[in-house]
Regions:
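Hydrophobic, aromatic-enriched interface-forming segments
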Residues: 114-187
Length: 284
């Protein structure tokens, strides 16, 4: 996304904005149009009132690019006019941004990011998609900035995969195997419904450890995977993922707790008391 915007706008600035189910950044209410500034809200799910405020203030200079089903449905339910931009749950924000800005196919670097964000586990998942994601997100000892020529030079992209991405992926797999012993089957109870999940309190914060564990224990029937991070002193940050073949909608469940996301993956927070109220262990 940054690379695409830098190609289009030489003087683009990037701001880290707190948003979503935790809080809305106060700076959003203080932004004022100046006749030449455009705002791109990319991969970000403001509450509808905040989006409406920015749309009214900036008009077509406010561009919203997003793919979170919870945010898109919340906006649709208002009946308000759609802001400028592009929104589609079938692609990642990186792919949508490229498509919005350029009349050209997305490069491999963007395509792999797209597949990772949508959890499309094809034949390239472990050799290309996941290793490239580790480079992009600067995990472990990755260089802080990779050479942006990877978007046009596929040989350079392959060099980054071999030198950084694939070794880091192997190391991460080792960490996941070490964490597998901490997997707990739990039941999440909500509005009279019970969902059987595999739970892990994990610093890696995604479902791959749980999915791999589940493949080794197919006799355990679960609806999805719950990855948690205890944030002292008073809350849990949680990511919910659907298991293959499951009929649950992660975004719907997350919305009931004030969160949101995608049908297959979503996030929310719980206080310690709500965590103990809604989530219980069950026997394997």
């Amino acid at each position: 996304v940054r690379h695409a915007l830098r190609q289009r706008y030489a003087d683009v600035q990037f701001e880290c904005i707190r948003h979503g189910y935790l809080c809305e950044d106060r700076r959003l209410q203080e932004l004022r149009p100046d006749g030449h500034t455009q705002i791109y809200a990319v991969d970000i799910s403001f509450c509808p009132e905040t989006t409406r405020h920015l749309q009214r203030a900036f008009g077509s200079d406010f561009v919203w690019i997003d793919h979170h089903i919870s945010a898109l449905e919340a906006w649709r339910d208002t009946g308000w006019e759609h802001p400028a931009g592009i929104r589609d749950t079938a692609h990642s924000a990186a792919w949508l941004t490229w498509h919005h800005l350029f009349d050209a196919p997305a490069p491999l670097a963007v395509t792999w990011a797209d597949k990772y964000d949508l959890w499309q586990q094809d034949a390239e998942w472990e050799t290309r998609t996941c290793p490239w994601q580790l480079v992009v997100t600067c995990r472990f000892s990755t260089p802080e900035r990779y050479d942006l020529r990877v978007f046009s030079d596929e040989r350079l992209l392959e060099t980054y995969l071999r030198r950084y991405g694939q070794p880091m992926f192997a190391y991460e797999q080792h960490l996941r195997r070490r964490e597998a012993g901490a997997v707990q089957p739990v039941v999440l109870s909500l509005d009279g419904h019970s969902y059987r999940l595999l739970f892990l309190n994990s610093s890696l914060r995604d479902s791959q450890t749980l999915a791999a564990w589940h493949r080794r224990h197919p006799e355990i029937n679960v609806d999805g995977y719950l990855v948690g991070q205890h944030v002292p002193p008073l809350r849990w940050k949680l990511s919910l993922y659907t298991a293959n073949g499951s009929g649950i909608n992660a975004a719907r469940i997350a919305q009931r707790f004030g969160g949101g996301g995608h049908a297959s993956a979503a996030g929310f927070t719980l206080s310690l008391s709500d965590f103990e109220k809604h989530i219980k262990t069950f026997q394997k």
